[in-house]
Amino acid sequence: MSRKLLCLLLCVSLLAFSGCVPVTVSAEDPPVTADEPTPPPNPGPVSAPSLEPKPEPAPEPETSLTPTIEYETYTGDIPHIFIHCLIAYPEVKGNDGNMLYDADCINGTEFRRLLTALYANGYCLIDIHDTFELTADGWRQKESVSVPVGRKPLIFSVDDVTYDQRKRSCGMVDFLGFDENGEFTAGIYRSDGSVEYTKEEFVFILEDFIAEYPDFSSHDARMTLCMTGFTGQFGYRTDIDDDNVDIRDAEIEKAKTVAEQFRALGYTFACHGFGHYDATKLSLRGMEEDLRCVKEQVEPVVGPMTVYVYPYGKTLTPGDSRYEAMLDTGFVEFCSVSHFFYRRDYADGRSLYMTRIGIDGYSLRNYGEALAPLFDVHQIIDTENRK
């Protein structure tokens, strides 16, 4: 054996006893270095995120709480009744033991009974403006109107929605407006300067009734409010007067807000004269001045009006210069007060006429026969507060 081979064998022997353990490597597996982490299992191919928007889930169908009202065409008479603002506090009585304004008004109890009786007898409210139209022959009363199936039309108006300051502490509310929570309400001024809010007025009682009986309102019709202006509107001093110069602008804005609320609910407005004058006693100049005040002080709050409701029911006739002045101002339908219901056209097609019956202490006692088709007066009158 050569010297070189002997040295090589000696080196191999020394390595075998050096304490290093040899690593056996399979010829089938590639070596893995210690400083490289073992790769995770292959999860398979991953799709790229779609750029298309995901479809929104279909909304669940809403369940309507308002019943569907079906309509039909009605041909026949259309009665027109009216009230004044309600007696909210019938306990306030005069020396005769009756409510103040006993002959001219009804109270909240009577108004609720009235609505119930009208509904039971098949009536529903319609908008007075839906009862007439402009045709090729001029203005004409419509021969038919649309009403909920099985119901009969009724026009219902409210006179003097002004809340005259002279009537404070007489059992009526003092104004319509909004409370500290922004809720539409009525209020009275207490002697200590505080305000007491109440819902004992026609608008709130009617809204509650329609919420319960939706078909009492045809096409969302409500009442027609007959406005004067000599002592403001809705309890606010919107009239031009030396006593309210400093507050008038603010009062107008408050009144406008109330008018907007009424319109949103479906109420309409009619003119009841600015000064609530007997038209038959006004001169032509006096009538023109009254109409000017309506245009300048009332319509800016409630909007344009085409229906004129005669104060005291005192009427003028076509051809009268004062009547012509009202036509020139834009009025078309003229309403009086009577103990029977009547509507008519005029041959010239320039205007229309209808009567109304007031619902008040006087008529409840004296017009039972005329009102019998609508309701039984004995079911309405509040005998506890009327003698």
Q: What residue ranges belong to the model's regions?
A:
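Active-site beta->alpha N-cap acidic-glycine motif
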Residues: T73-Q261, L265
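Short, catalytically relevant binding-site loops at active-site mouths
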Residues: F230-Q233, G275-D278, K314-T315
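Hydrophobic core
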Residues: L10-L15
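C-terminal active-site subregion of NodB/CE4 polysaccharide deacetylases
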Residues: E60-I128, R140-S157, Y163-R168, A264, ...
